[in-house]
Amino acid sequence: MSFKRDGDDSSQLNVLKKRRVADLLASYIPEDEALLLKNGSYACTVCHHRPVFNTIDMLSVHRTGKKHLGGLQRYYGKKLEHKNEIQKRRHFDFVRAEDAGEKPPPGPAPLLVQTKRITQNALLKSAPYNSCCSNKKVVANSRNVYDPHSGPSTTTGLNVPLDTQPGPSQPHTSLHSPPTGPCSSPTDEIPPNKNNSRHKKKGEEKFRKEIADPERERNMEHYLQLKSSGWIPDGTGKWVKDENVEFDSDEEEPPALPPS
């Protein structure tokens, strides 16, 4: 889609081209220069005061400022010094191993490692997410549920030694240990939950019926075909033409559902 502009000023055209390129490259920010926070904001990792921005457009405007450009030079200067220091230490270890007559372990070629990383990223369906914010949450439950197949239960909040064996005169008793006797067994005390299994079976049967229903599948295909052809529902159960779509024919009614 192209937009008309007033006048034939070449400078104005260049300004529009530059703005368009800047908009397209706004999201092209290296992963180590920005940080995605838990609340959806963006933090600049280049500047020492870590400014936070609500949108990526505001972050792009900040990246064009003088303070950020100055901090960018210092940031990459420190990274270059760190890289040179690592290379010097590796060279020192290599020379020391040669003087001692030892054979240094062969390491992967840097160019080969870089090529392999680029190839792996190119084969991915989406860009690899790299951020310090982790969505994994570990939920600790202090209550213990007895499982007959897992043996004796263990407590989360109490430090109970497991290697101490109770003597014959002092039987070991616990609130979480199941009662033992000739008339009771763990499997009898904890019957399987039949309601959950019934609901699960009903849900699976309903899902299979929806998948195997040809009428529903035909209706879905017809709906998708109308949407792709430029027809939109008006909310009353009827289909109307989209004003932003050009139609080849002058038909006022959408194509009907084909017979089965």
Swiss-Prot record:
UniProt subcellular location: Nucleus, Nucleoplasm; Nucleus speckle
GO (cellular component) term, any one: spliceosomal complex
ZnF Matrin-type: positions: 42-74
Taxonomy, superkingdom: Eukaryota
Chain intervals with Acidic residues compositional bias: 245-254
Compositionally biased region (Polar residues): 166-187
Keywords: Metal-binding, mRNA processing, mRNA splicing, Nucleus, Spliceosome, Zinc, Zinc-finger
Compositionally biased tracts (Basic and acidic residues): 202-221
Sequence motif Bipartite nuclear localization signal, location on chain: 4-20
Keyword Manganese attributed: no
UniProt subunit comment: Component of the minor spliceosome, which splices U12-type introns.
Functional summary from the UniProt entry: As a component of the minor spliceosome, involved in the splicing of U12-type introns in pre-mRNAs.
Protein name per Swiss-Prot or TrEMBL: Sodium channel modifier 1
The organism of origin for this protein: Xenopus laevis (African clawed frog)
